[in-house]
Amino acid sequence: MASFGVRGMGQPLGIRICCCRVCTCINFGFVLSRIGLLKLMQLGLAMLCEGLLIRYGVPYADSIGQALTSFLATTGHCFTTTGILLLCYAFSDKSYSLIRQSLFETLFNGLASCMYFSSSSYMGFACVVWLHPQFLVRPGFWAYPAMTACYYMGYAAGILHALDAYLAFRHFRGAR
């Protein structure tokens, strides 16, 4: 049975299979840590939002308007940057110690939180004003429930990024 190695004193990284270790370049200790799980949740919410926006929002872009563009830009930006950070942190302890203590993490997560709250509010307005009346009269109009779920998940992603900004700021200030 494979056991996941975590970074500890004298314990190597990777997956232990029988008498050898494979994938020693991956730091599973980070991926399963509090910050790693927070990054994974941010990625998951961004991926779900992006999928819903493309599948159900793009066909009704005329009805939704700029709220769709705003939300797509927010999820795309946050998904890409969070994914790159997660990859860097999972493959390099040095990257984690250098980037996490810099001001970049705090500013990125603070900006991402503001962008998610802003675009979610705009999407909520678009849902109530333009999509809900169509949902009441057109059977099988799935854009309204999908976009509603999207802006709810956007608020959740904004909260996660705000929490990550707070934790990054504490790390920046020296509290580990």
UniProtKB/Swiss-Prot annotation:
TM region(s), chain numbering: 13-35, 71-91, 111-131, 140-160
BP-aspect Gene Ontology terms: adult somatic muscle development; muscle organ development; myoblast fusion
One Pfam family this sequence matches: MARVEL
GO cellular component: membrane
Domain of life according to the entry: Eukaryota
Reported impact of A46V: In sing-22; myoblast fusion is abolished and consequently multinucleated myofibers fail to form during embryonic muscle development
Keywords recorded for this protein, A-Z: Membrane, Myogenesis, Transmembrane, Transmembrane helix
Induction statement: By Mef2 during myoblast fusion in developing muscles of embryos and pupae.
Disruption phenotype: RNAi-mediated knockdown in pupae is adult lethal. Pupae develop to the pharate adult stage and die before eclosion from the pupal case. In pupae, fusion-competent myoblasts (FCMs) fail to fuse with the muscle founder templates. Pharate adults display adherent muscle formation; only partially developed dorsal longitudinal muscles appear to be present but they are smaller and their nuclei are reduced in number and clustered together. RNAi-mediated knockdown in embryos reduces myoblast fusion.
Compartment list: Membrane
PROSITE patterns given in the database record: MARVEL
Topological relation to the membrane, as annotated: Multi-pass membrane protein
InterPro entries tied to this protein: Marvel
Domain spans labelled MARVEL: 30-173
Predominant cellular place of this UniProt entry's protein: membrane
Miscellaneous comment text of the record: Named 'singles bar' based upon the accumulation of single myoblasts in mutant embryos.
Function field: Essential for myoblast fusion in developing embryos and pupae, and consequently is essential for muscle formation in adults. Required for progression past the pre-fusion complex stage of myoblast fusion.
Name of the protein: Protein singles bar
Originating organism: Drosophila melanogaster (Fruit fly)
Gene from which the chain derives: sing
